[in-house]
Curated annotation (Swiss-Prot):
Pathway the protein contributes to: Purine metabolism; AMP biosynthesis via de novo pathway; AMP from IMP: step 2/2; Purine metabolism; IMP biosynthesis via de novo pathway; 5-amino-1-(5-phospho-D-ribosyl)imidazole-4-carboxamide from 5-amino-1-(5-phospho-D-ribosyl)imidazole-4-carboxylate: step 2/2
Positions of the catalytic residues: 141 (proton donor/acceptor), 262 (proton donor/acceptor)
Any single biological process term in GO: 'de novo' AMP biosynthetic process
Family: Belongs to the lyase 1 family. Adenylosuccinate lyase subfamily.
Origin species: Helicobacter pylori (strain ATCC 700392 / 26695)
Gene: purB
Lineage: Bacteria, Pseudomonadati, Campylobacterota, Epsilonproteobacteria, Campylobacterales
Keyword Nucleotide-binding: no
Protein name: Adenylosuccinate lyase
Function, in words: Catalyzes two reactions in de novo purine nucleotide biosynthesis. Catalyzes the breakdown of 5-aminoimidazole- (N-succinylocarboxamide) ribotide (SAICAR or 2-[5-amino-1-(5-phospho-beta-D-ribosyl)imidazole-4-carboxamido]succinate) to 5-aminoimidazole-4-carboxamide ribotide (AICAR or 5-amino-1-(5-phospho-beta-D-ribosyl)imidazole-4-carboxamide) and fumarate, and of adenylosuccinate (ADS or N(6)-(1,2-dicarboxyethyl)-AMP) to adenosine monophosphate (AMP) and fumarate.
Length: 440
């Protein structure tokens, strides 16, 4: 975890102090459960819950000998207690404590992620509504296609982010699960009721079945969901980067007073935040393979998953949280240039209306193949003009004029009918209906 890419609230969940505090919370829940089952006296339960404490430095010191951080933890806590310490960590195994504590930490962390996703969705929605009717050219393969609105672009992003909210709700069900089932998961030394009570105290569900550990398909699902979320965020960031290119310049990341874009070129204003988000997304996705490989543990459990999770889980949550907040800020403060969008629309010389003309001809009795041939032939002439660099913004009617002078077209379409094809409103007439689908 790098401090540079961490928000304080999420970072506070993933440190040694919080980890052992959560272990202690689980251990106390187990003590309370034993007490409720009549196996530990009230006085011992009260003493443990009131007095149990640990010291990080002491845990590290003990671990030098034990080579086992959970045993170092329980030994340290026992030193803070009296005779009642005999009931601390009673009847359970290390993974009962560790995995149940991890469920608590992941649940809290995922709630922060969900909050970040909701914030991003609302920001995208608000900006989409703001630019619902802001005309721009749509591009496929990076090449001009047909007129759309910037609002549609943002609405598409918003709808995708909304799908992640649904997916994360399901993932929350999978990870908010504790297990207090003993060394082999067969409840040999503690009844099922102990697990049920302890998890109830902690606000967790119980796993239907476990072995020594909670099964890692749950963790892998989380990693994959966060990777998918990152890919969607990268998609937004990459599009912003393309739209900020100098020759496009339809949007721009906010550029603050005193900000610098280059140590050598004073004129530079770069989409550095979107580029940063793109890089963070690569890091997030990189954890999916080891987390998926953690699913296949030997028999009732081996240790191969532990080292992966010590890296992956903190970094997955911290980086995802930072990515979401940064992207939300980028979208919220994004500068949009509608005039440049209109200017770029005009740069096609009217070619963006080609399909409209194509669809009118078959209505007049011409075959689709011949219609396509006539329209494409005229379009290619305009491409040649564009390729030569002789085009001016005042030539946005190049394609229209070429069609009006084509004798073959005149047999099927009147001048007014051809001109009627060059209407931006035709391409935006369903924007309201689309927005209703997405946002209502």
């Amino acid at each position: 975890m790098l401090e540079r890419y961490a928000n304080e609230e999420m970072k506070a969940l993933w440190n040694e102090q919080t980890k052992f505090e959560t272990y202690l919370e689980v251990e106390k829940a187990v003590v309370r459960a034993w007490n409720k089952l009549g196996q530990i006296q009230d006085s011992d339960c009260e003493k443990i819950c009131a007095k149990a404490a640990f010291n990080l430095e002491r845990i590290k010191e003990i671990e030098k000998t034990t080579k086992h951080d959970l045993i170092a933890f329980t030994t340290c806590v026992a030193e803070s207690l009296g005779e009642e310490s005999r009931f601390f960590h009673y009847g359970i195994t290390s993974s009962d404590c560790i995995d149940t504590a991890m469920a608590l930490l992941m649940t809290k962390s995922l709630k922060l992620i969900q909050k970040g996703v909701k914030n991003l969705y609302e920001t995208l929605k608000n900006r989409a509504l703001e630019h619902k009717d802001t005309l721009m050219v749509g591009r496929s393969h990076g090449v001009f296609g047909e007129p759309i609105t910037f609002g549609l672009v943002l609405a598409l992003f918003a709808d995708e982010i909304k799908r992640h909210l649904k997916a994360l709700d399901l993932t929350m069900e999978f990870i908010s699960v504790g297990a207090i089932s003993g060394a082999m998961g067969n409840f040999a030394h503690a009844p099922l009721e102990l697990e049920e009570l302890a998890c109830e105290f902690l606000g967790l569900k119980t796993a239907n079945i476990s072995n020594q550990v909670i099964q890692r398909d749950r963790y892998a699902r989380l990693a994959c969901d966060l990777a998918l979320l990152a890919s969607s965020c990268e998609k937004i960031a990459v599009n912003i980067r393309h739209l900020q290119r100098s020759e496009v310049y339809e949007v721009e990341e906010a550029f603050s007073t005193g900000q610098k874009g280059s140590s050598a070129m004073p004129h530079k204003r770069n989409p550095i935040l979107s580029e940063n988000i793109t890089g963070l997304c690569r890091v997030i996705r990189s954890f999916t393979t080891p987390m998926l490989e953690n699913v296949a543990l030997w028999h009732e459990r081996d240790m191969s998953h532990s080292s992966v999770e010590r890296f992956a889980l903190p970094d997955l949550f911290i980086t995802s949280d930072f990515m979401l907040s940064r992207l939300n800020s980028v979208i919220k403060n994004l500068v949009v240039y509608p005039k440049n969008m209109l200017k770029n629309l005009a740069l096609s010389g009217g070619l963006v209306f080609s399909q409209r003309v194509l669809l009118e001809l078959p209505k007049k009795g011409l075959s689709r193949e011949e219609s396509y041939s006539i329209v494409q032939e005229n379009a290619m002439k305009i491409w040649e003009v564009l390729q030569q660099g002789a085009f001016k913004n005042t030539d946005e009617n190049l394609f229209l004029n070429a069609l009006l002078n084509d004798e073959r077209l005149k047999k099927y379409l009147s001048e007014d009918e051809i001109k009627a094809c060059f209407d931006y409103n035709y391409y935006t007439k369903n924007v309201g209906a689309i927005f209703k689908r997405v946002f209502e």
